[in-house]
Regions:
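Active-site hotspot residues in diverse enzymes, especially metal/ion-binding acidic/histidine motifs
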Residues: 1-191
């Protein structure tokens, strides 16, 4: 959702217990498959682990805001469980073993090169390895720059919004919420 109202706390994603099904919301405005795959895997983990019930919402703050993340996740067992399952889904121990020998002070080009080689050899997502390295060593700028070297970006936001538009029947959304849906998705005013 690219157009959330100003003043809302920065978040990467959320999962909502809407009626009889979970709804995953991706709010991060990055176009990297690696970022998006982790966010979706993390939110899906909340569902699989039974953290979400009808009427319950879990909003995950920005992972890149390490000070907020560290203080909140240390006391939030569910976030830790969701992170662990998401990381397992995206690379299990293989990814951790691969990046364990990578130097913490590597620059973006080194991270990208190592990520690409390891990804090919082990059928993993190179961008995920780069971000996992950034998370492990709290070196987000280098990890994000490495994604640029990998050229793994796509118009993920556009693709997700197109899928949402194909699958959301606005006629089933309450009249007073249609304008809000149009605003936060950037679809323009609903007639």
């Amino acid at each position: 959702l690219p157009h959330l109202p100003v003043g809302l706390r920065k978040m990467d994603g959320a999962v909502l217990g809407a009626a009889d099904r979970p709804v995953i919301v991706v709010a991060r405005r990055k176009s990297s498959r690696a970022w998006l795959s982790f966010i979706v895997a993390h939110e899906l983990a909340h569902v699989v682990l039974g953290h979400v019930r009808p009427g319950v919402s879990i909003v995950d703050v920005s992972l890149q805001d390490m000070s907020t993340y560290a203080s909140e996740s240390a006391t939030d067992r569910q976030e830790g469980e969701a992170d662990a399952l998401a990381l397992r889904l995206l690379g299990d121990g293989v990814a951790d073993t691969l990046i364990a020998n990578w130097l913490p002070n590597w620059g973006p080009a080194q991270i990208a090169a190592a990520s690409r080689l390891a990804a090919r050899a082990h059928r993993l997502e190179a961008g995920h390895l780069a971000l996992r390295h950034g998370f492990r060593h709290q070196r987000w700028p280098e990890a994000v720059s490495a994604l640029g070297f990998l050229s793994e970006d796509l118009d993920a936001e556009g693709e997700l919004l197109a899928q949402l538009k194909r699958n959301v029947d606005l006629d089933r959304v309450a009249d007073d919420l249609q304008d809000m849906v149009a605003q936060i998705t950037g679809w323009g005013r609903v007639a």
